[in-house]
Amino acid sequence: MKTRAVNHPKIFDLPKLRDRVHVFRDRARAGKVLASMLDEYRGSDALVMGIPAGGTAVAVEIARELHLPLDIAVVSKITLPWNSEAGYGAVAFDGTVMLNEELLSRLNLSDHEIQTGIKKTEQKVARRVTMFRGDRPLPDFKRPIILVDDGLASGFTLRVAIKALRGNGAGNLILAVPTAHSESMQMILEEVEAIYCPNLRSGLSFAVADAYELWSDLGEQDVVRILQGFGNASGAV
């Protein structure tokens, strides 16, 4: 499928899907669309890495379509004590921690509360790494890495994943997301080599779920099922 750069040679989208909602039936369909945009990597030495939970369902379709290996980059936001949906930072699979200092400067959180949140999130990430990857060592990151999520809203967790991958030797990072807000994409643009996003949107209101006809949150067991299904079909994860 032909792609087109938007105002920057590193951004590739699908013009017919710009500023539209409900353009994908589900995450699986979004993954297939992205795979068609990433066809140059078919059968290459690239590695597809999904961000659990939702990104795994997109990533598995890219890996299947392009005959590439699949792995995951576990990342979790550090949530506020009074709001589990909002976060002031994130922790990545290798222990990388990134805090939103601008947000923290506006919050009345004590150092103890901040450190407690970090510790709890580190434990959660470690548990998920074991659940999803077992005791397998980290893969070789010195090859093209296609980092996949189901959408790009604020971009904070993606930035933590990118920082962790860079810290482990990744030199060629390609971000693949079905949908993104244009301003968030600009913020993350210089941190990767290329961004593939079929549904690029702008405006005051943005929700990742609006790109999909069918949307539901995925849990840990959904991720395990997806990874096991891919492993059974391909012989490796």
Stretch-by-stretch model annotation:
Residues 1-237:
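PRPP-associated nucleotide enzymes
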